[in-house]
């Protein structure tokens, strides 16, 4: 154990070095945070001490940040052995040019940049422009050339298998720098050209390069230096090093020589990873316990669609000057908060205000270079890792509380940082069965020094433009030291976000920082609203709209109309039509009877029975008598109806129609008896608009119905607004479809009669028959509808030409789909269409949005918006914290004003919960989720009670339905979770395009929502079921979907076995890499749901490329395909000869099932043994007993197995085929190589009695064509007939000697094979493969190098030259030279492809050869 006093001095010196101060300036008992130590430096200390074998963790150090406390911790923790690191030795030089592993962050960038990835399609990219003067192009080029030699990572190449290599330096070649000379160009043209350069470079993916410099020469000796870096090659700290070195080299100063390379660093880290890692393992276990509870990333408001580029990034920035920075950090340190966490907390606060939840995952990159060599800090490369913070700001109402919460989250996560954030994300993805991203990033570069050192700005000028972006990153908030202060900037994919969101968020963060810097009180004061003043003003203006109330009760307008126009029609019904006078008389009769039965003012009367025209008189009579009506329809189950009667405190009951079966515990009147009795005199008393008018019972979340009490004045606000908005009058006729229990009936009755119009009653027998509705509209020339969306959908299905009389159609109560407006316009061109929002508690409706141009509604609209509040009403969208949500942020819709209910009958607790006081007024909490648009329009986005948990994600079913309805061909959708305790999403969809399928819907949906929001099951229905009240019947939808899934036997996507050899091979590769049994991986199972991630996907792709000869496969394809079935389809679709893949897969499966000894003994699978007249290494593929055969000669290094597929294609054409095996490979590996081509040909000729198979057709590829030519000469001299020689991609014999020497070194031989295109670079990583390949190729090259043939040497056989039209080695002219070597017929043919065109055209070539044989 280290002595505590000595330890204290050591720690003091290390901390002083990090802070850049004298050791004696640090008091052992002082809080180090207060003296400038931040979390980044603290984490570097942890890493440094752990590598020395000292058992410390970040959380413990952060809890007691003093030298005294740390000395005790360190001295107590020195018993752990330091981590051993393998010495790289001279590997950096001896293996120059060889591939080496990428770092985890490099791999993430490499995978994420592919188009098929979520938030992919972009590179990790940093682009900076320096505006300076007199930068010299030649000096810059010379400096850049030396820079590229100094830092090999500037030459790095990222290979398709997910590794990287640094090719040898290109000798004296200068680093390429493009120079644009605009010194003599007009100013406006200069601006245009500079803008064009910026536009092109700022978001480019560098092709084949990772570092690019360009210089623009400007008038007045000004210059602009454009610096572009692919951050897959170099991290942010490396960028500082690059520019500092470039500036020094430009100035003629040589930086100190480097004795270490990034390649060596990565090799050392990889070696360390292979050793036992007890700290990492413990941290992995710690994270594993928390994976199920980790939150989602921030759910920020995104753009539904539009033309904006969703890949391009924009920047927001603010510079905190030194005074502001010092004040802010001093106040933070006084509270024990580090500067980095102060800035992080301000960012987290913004995320919480604009996100769906105040708890979320935040991604923190860490810059950590392990001190493996003194030069590590001078290297360029990727040294980053990441940390995931579980940030929870719930209840953190002050800046101090938020900062403490974020700092505590950092301490907790950093205490387990040996298991990096990328690994945690992969584990989280496995747990949830879908890819999980952490696309919101906070990058702190505090403590790394100024972004651009003075030398850089002195040489190249001031940075005038900076932008960065990264794959799978939406928003990167960065803080860095700059120009003596702190630069706070965001690089953000603005096209993804809703308009105005990023500006508002960034402004709020800056305001927060300035507020905290300005005074201590701000830290502990309640936080100001996040609602920008401009947005508040828009809402205040809309909420402030008023209209003078009439001060009348609901029925007053009717009685006035009855006096003014007694003979006008009031009701059209199957039970009989009524004029206003007749209806007034019936209403008076009802009122008189109720009074006679003991009704007092304010008493409640239940109205029971089926829907009829007489009910209009019933409710008018109840209200005229001073009563309150409470309807109970015939659809109510008896038990529920009786509970409503009891809860509703009913005093009397009025039964419309026959006596009901419900037990009514109060005096009851039959409406028929009342209307049949002699008229009784009734004199209405004065009405009270503040009195209750009706009680409507709606469903309760507890299963107990709740009765909503609505006063006359509240309902009158809706009635008066409706009449005023649509300018309704005596000429209008209303179709009254809603039952009395439905609040829509309030408008059907009272708005119609108050305006002097007539009601066309849909009675009980007709209310489920949309064709009957259309007949009524047509017959009575109905002009006004007040409908639920489901009703209008059904009506438009059958409307035909019967709806043209409509002029005012209002739809509300559920999602109002835009297609309803479009379809209505076709059938009723004169109709005005409005969507309304509200609830029974808001007196039917509270908001309105009139569609002005139904034919041109935005295609991304999922629903018609709620719109704006009615006059005298006000709305709020409220977060869980109780604060107003900014524009585009979803929250609960609150409604206040004249048009809200009084509460719930007999439920004071529920009333207090849903009707709340705020700012001196009562607000109703609707439970609807809504958001504001920038113009104050409210959009309905779902119901709070429709939120579900899927794979750990919180999912809003309404968002899925909205996305479905945006798809072409889909006009209705409903999503649900299948019953039975599962978290399986399903959706019912109605389509109007026969070409739309369930699978195409799922595929298209992937462009709109994350994978976890794509329903596993999609069922196409003719119609979405609706309740009688016109809302989606979600219970019925769930039952239908569950029945369909049960019927198809596909509830949980059970195991599906492979059906083809290729699928079997793919399953074997995938299962091996996932560590699963073969039968545990079905062909329709999602790779990532089985536990796959980007790293394992890379391994799968490497395996497929290696074993199935599929070099075109990329990691992005795994993310696009996701299942074995889809992957097999993708691979087959890319093959010109699909059978080839099946053959390759068959060979792979044979090998995969062998032992290693079996593999070595059977590297060349033999179709059948040759006849005894031939050597065993002559492979025969029997096709026919007819005379004549094809003899195949492989290419240099090629084994007989490589031509198995050609042989099988020839056999399929009824041709007997032989393939010869050269020595030094496969089963002839121990045979000595031939000294020359002639000797090889002689050995092959003597390998069998070729007279038995004559006449022969010879086929040779590349070198094999030369061997075949010499074989033909031997055959003809020995009387063996040769019909033809097919020379495939081979030089003519007379041209070989003039071609120059062939490579001899192993490295050059391999490079030559790759260049020819016949050897996948991935295979060269396999040492066993290389060990088998190189000796064979070198033996063949030696034989070929000594070959020479005069141009006049000919054979009698015909020669057919064949090649690929894109073969860069064997040109058309070289193939034509074969003509000089035959005295017979010569032909020349080309196929599309390169040197190994044959792989893509096996069948076509086999047919050509076979036709010649026969």
Swiss-Prot record:
Record's cofactor remark: Binds 2 phosphopantetheines covalently.
Matching InterPro entries: AA_adenyl_dom, AB_hydrolase_fold, ACP-like_sf, AMP-bd_C, AMP-bd_C_sf, AMP-binding_CS, AMP-dep_synth/lig_dom, ANL_N_sf
PROSITE patterns attached to this UniProt entry: AMP_BINDING (PS00455), CARRIER (PS50075), PHOSPHOPANTETHEINE (PS00012)
Record PTM text: 4'-phosphopantetheine is transferred from CoA to a specific serine in each of the two carrier protein domains, leading to their activation from apo to holo forms.
Enzyme class: ligase
Modified residues (O-(pantetheine 4'-phosphoryl)serine): 39, 1094
Signal peptide: none
Annotated region described as Thioesterase, given as residue ranges: 1188-1413
Carrier domain segment(s): 5-78, 1057-1135
Keyword Transmembrane part of the UniProt annotation: no
A family per Pfam: AMP-binding_C
Disulphide bridges: none
Pathway field: Siderophore biosynthesis; mycobactin biosynthesis
Single GO BP term: amino acid activation for nonribosomal peptide biosynthetic process
Keywords of the record: Ligase, Multifunctional enzyme, Phosphopantetheine, Phosphoprotein, Repeat
Region: Adenylation, residue numbers: 579-975
GO cellular component terms attached to this protein's record: cytoplasm
Gene3D superfamilies assigned: 3.30.300.30, ACP-like, alpha/beta hydrolase, Chloramphenicol acetyltransferase-like domain, N-terminal domain of ligase-like, Nonribosomal peptide synthetase, condensation domain
Annotated family: Belongs to the ATP-dependent AMP-binding enzyme family. MbtB subfamily.
Domain comment, as recorded: Modular protein that contains an aryl carrier protein (ArCP) domain which bears a phosphopantetheinyl arm to attach the activated salicylic acid, a condensation/cyclization domain involved in the formation of the oxazoline ring, an adenylation domain which activates the serine or threonine residue into an aminoacyl-AMP ester, a peptidyl carrier protein (PCP) domain which bears a phosphopantetheinyl arm to attach the activated serine or threonine, and a terminal thioesterase domain which assists in the transfer of intermediates from MbtB to ACP1 in MbtD.
Function: Involved in the initial steps of the mycobactin biosynthetic pathway. Putatively couples activated salicylic acid with serine or threonine and cyclizes this precursor to the hydroxyphenyloxazoline ring system present in this class of siderophores. Essential for growth in macrophages.
Protein name stated in the entry: Phenyloxazoline synthase MbtB
Organism for this UniProt entry: Mycobacterium tuberculosis (strain CDC 1551 / Oshkosh)
């Amino acid at each position: 154990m280290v002595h505590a006093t000595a330890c204290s001095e050591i720690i003091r010196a290390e901390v002083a070095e990090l802070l850049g101060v004298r050791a004696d300036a640090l008091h052992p008992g002082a809080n180090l945070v207060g003296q400038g130590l931040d979390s980044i430096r603290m984490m570097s200390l942890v890493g440094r001490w752990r590598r020395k074998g000292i058992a410390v963790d970040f959380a413990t150090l952060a809890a007691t940040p003093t030298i005294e406390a740390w000395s005790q911790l360190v001295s107590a923790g020195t018993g752990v052995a330091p981590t051993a690191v393998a010495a790289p030795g001279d590997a950096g030089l001896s293996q120059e040019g060889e591939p080496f592993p990428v770092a985890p962050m490099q791999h993430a960038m490499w995978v994420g940049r592919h188009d098929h990835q979520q938030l992919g399609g972009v590179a990790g990219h940093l682009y900076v422009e320096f505006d300076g003067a007199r930068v010299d192009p030649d000096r810059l080029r010379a400096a850049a050339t030396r820079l590229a030699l100094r830092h090999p990572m500037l030459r790095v190449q990222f290979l398709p298998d997910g590794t990287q290599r640094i090719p040898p330096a290109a000798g004296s070649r200068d680093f390429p720098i493009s120079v644009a000379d605009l010194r003599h160009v007009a100013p406006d043209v200069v601006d245009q050209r500079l803008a064009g350069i910026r536009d092109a470079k700022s978001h480019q993916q560098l092709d084949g390069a990772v570092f690019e410099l360009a210089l623009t020469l400007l008038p007045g000796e000004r210059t602009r230096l454009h610096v572009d870096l692919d951050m897959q090659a170099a991290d942010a700290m490396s960028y500082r090093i690059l520019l500092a070195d470039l500036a020094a080299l430009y100035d003629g100063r040589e930086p100190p020589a480097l004795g270490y390379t990034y390649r060596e660093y990565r090799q050392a880290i990889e070696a360390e990873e292979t050793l036992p890692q007890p700290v990492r393992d413990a941290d992995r276990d710690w994270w594993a316990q928390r994976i199920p509870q980790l939150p989602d990333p921030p759910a920020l408001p995104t753009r539904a669609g539009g033309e904006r580029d969703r890949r391009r990034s924009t920047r927001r920035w603010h510079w905190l000057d030194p005074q502001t920075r010092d004040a802010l950090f001093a106040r933070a340190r006084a509270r024990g908060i580090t500067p980095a966490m102060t800035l992080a907390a301000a960012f987290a606060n913004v995320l919480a205000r604009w996100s769906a939840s105040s708890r979320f995952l935040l991604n923190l990159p860490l810059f950590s270079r392990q001190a493996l060599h003194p030069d590590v800090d001078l290297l360029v490369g990727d040294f980053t890792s990441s940390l995931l913070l579980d940030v929870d700001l719930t209840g953190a109402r002050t800046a101090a509380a938020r900062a403490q919460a974020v700092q505590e989250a950092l301490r907790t996560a950093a205490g387990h940082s040996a298991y990096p954030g990328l690994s945690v994300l992969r584990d989280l993805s496995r747990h949830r069965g879908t890819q999980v991203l952490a696309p919101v990033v906070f990058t702190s570069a505090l403590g790394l020094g100024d972004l651009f050192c003075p030398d850089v700005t002195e040489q190249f000028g001031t940075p005038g433009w900076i932008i960065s972006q990264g794959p799978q990153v939406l928003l990167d908030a960065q803080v860095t030291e700059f120009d003596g202060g702190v630069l706070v900037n965001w690089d953000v994919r603005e096209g993804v976000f809703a308009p105005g969101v990023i500006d508002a968020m960034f402004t709020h963060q800056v305001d927060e920082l300035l507020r905290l810097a300005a005074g201590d009180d701000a830290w502990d004061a309640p936080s100001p609203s996040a609602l920008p003043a401009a947005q508040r003003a828009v809402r205040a203006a809309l909420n402030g709209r008023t209209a003078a109330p009439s001060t009348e009760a609901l029925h007053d307008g009717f009685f006035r109309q009855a006096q003014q126009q007694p003979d006008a029609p009031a009701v059209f019904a199957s039970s009989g039509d009524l004029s206003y006078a007749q209806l007034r008389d019936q209403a008076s009769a009802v009122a008189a009877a109720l009074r006679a039965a003991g009704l007092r003012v304010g008493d409640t009367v239940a109205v029971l029975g089926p829907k009829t025209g007489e009910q209009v008189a019933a409710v008018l009579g109840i209200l005229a008598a001073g009563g309150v009506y409470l309807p109970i329809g015939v659809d109510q189950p008896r038990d529920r109806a009786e509970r409503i009667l009891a809860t509703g405190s009913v005093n009397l009951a009025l039964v419309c129609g026959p006596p009901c079966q419900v037990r009514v515990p109060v005096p009851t009147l039959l409406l028929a008896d009342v209307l049949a009795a002699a008229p009784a005199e009734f004199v209405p008393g004065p009405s009270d608009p503040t009195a209750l008018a009706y009680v409507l019972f709606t469903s309760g979340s507890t299963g107990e119905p709740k009765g909503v009490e609505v006063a006359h004045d509240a309902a009158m606000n809706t009635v008066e607004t409706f009449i005023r908005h649509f300018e309704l009058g005596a000429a209008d006729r209303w179709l009254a479809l809603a039952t009395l229990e439905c609040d829509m009936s309030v408008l059907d009755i009272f708005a119609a009669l108050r305006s002097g119009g007539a009601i066309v009653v849909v009675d009980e027998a007709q209310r489920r028959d949309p064709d009957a509705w259309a007949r009524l509209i047509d017959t009575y020339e109905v002009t006004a509808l007040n409908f639920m969306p489901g009703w209008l959908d059904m009506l438009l299905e059958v409307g035909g030409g019967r709806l043209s009389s409509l002029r005012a159609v209002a739809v509300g109560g559920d999602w109002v789909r835009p297609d309803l407006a479009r379809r209505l316009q076709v059938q009723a061109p004169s109709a005005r269409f409005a969507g309304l929002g509200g609830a029974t508690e808001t007196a039917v409706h509270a908001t309105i949005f009139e569609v002005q141009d139904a034919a041109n509604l935005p295609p991304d609209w999922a629903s018609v918006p709620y719109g704006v509040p009615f006059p005298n009403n006000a709305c709020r969208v409220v977060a869980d914290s109780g604060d107003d949500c900014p524009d585009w942020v979803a929250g609960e819709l609150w409604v206040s004003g004249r048009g809200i209910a009084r509460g719930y009958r007999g439920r004071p607790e529920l009333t207090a919960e849903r009707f709340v006081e705020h700012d001196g007024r009562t607000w109703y909490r609707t439970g609807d989720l809504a958001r504001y648009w920038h113009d104050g329009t409210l959009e309905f986005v779902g119901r709070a009670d429709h939120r579900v948990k899927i794979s750990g994600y919180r999912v809003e079913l309404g968002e899925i339905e909205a996305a479905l309805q945006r798809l072409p061909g889909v006009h209705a959708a409903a999503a649900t979770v299948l019953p039975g305790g599962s978290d399986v999403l399903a959706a019912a969809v109605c389509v109007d395009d026969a070409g739309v399928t369930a699978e195409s819907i799922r595929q298209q949906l992937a462009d709109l929502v994350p994978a976890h929001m794509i329903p596993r099951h999609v069922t196409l229905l003719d119609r979405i079921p609706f309740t009688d009240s016109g809302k989606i019947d979600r219970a019925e939808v769930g039952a239908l979907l569950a029945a369909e899934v049960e019927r198809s036997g596909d509830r949980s996507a059970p195991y599906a076995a492979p059906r083809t050899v290729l699928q079997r091979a793919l399953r074997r590769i995938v299962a091996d890499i996932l560590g699963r049994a073969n039968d545990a991986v079905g062909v329709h199972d999602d790779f990532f749901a089985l536990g796959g991630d980007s790293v394992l996907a890379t391994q799968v792709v490497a395996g497929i490329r290696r074993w199935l000869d599929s070099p075109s496969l990329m990691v992005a394809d795994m993310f696009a395909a996701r299942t074995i079935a889809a992957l097999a389809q993708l691979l087959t679709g890319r093959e010109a000869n699909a059978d080839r893949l099946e053959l390759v897969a068959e060979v792979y499966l044979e090998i995969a099932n062998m032992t290693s000894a079996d593999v070595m003994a059977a590297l060349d699978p033999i179709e059948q043994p040759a006849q005894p007249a031939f050597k065993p290494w002559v492979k025969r593929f029997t096709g026919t007993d007819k005379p004549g055969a094809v003899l195949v000669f492989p290419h240099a290094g090629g084994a007989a197995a490589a031509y198995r597929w050609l042989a099988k294609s020839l056999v399929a054409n009824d041709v007997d085929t032989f393939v010869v095996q050269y020595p030094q490979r496969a089963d002839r590996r121990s045979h000595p190589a031939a000294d020359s081509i002639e000797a090889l040909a002689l050995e092959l000729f003597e390998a069998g009695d070729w007279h038995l198979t004559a006449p022969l057709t010879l086929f040779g590829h590349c070198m094999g064509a030369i061997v075949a030519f010499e074989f033909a000469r031997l055959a003809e001299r020995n009387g063996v007939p040769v019909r033809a020689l097919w020379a495939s991609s081979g030089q003519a014999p007379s041209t070989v000697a003039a071609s120059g020497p062939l490579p001899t070194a192993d490295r050059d031989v391999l490079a030559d094979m790759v260049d020819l295109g016949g050897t996948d670079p991935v295979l060269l990583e396999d040492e066993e493969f290389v060990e088998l390949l190189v000796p064979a190729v070198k033996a063949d090259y030696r034989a070929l190098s000594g070959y020479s043939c005069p141009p006049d040497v000919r054979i009698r056989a015909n020669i057919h030259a064949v090649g690929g039209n894109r073969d860069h080695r064997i040109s058309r002219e070289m193939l034509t030279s074969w003509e000089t070597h035959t005295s017979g017929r010569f032909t020349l043919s080309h196929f599309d492809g390169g040197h190994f065109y044959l792989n893509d055209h096996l069948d076509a070539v086999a047919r050509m050869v076979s036709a010649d044989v026969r």
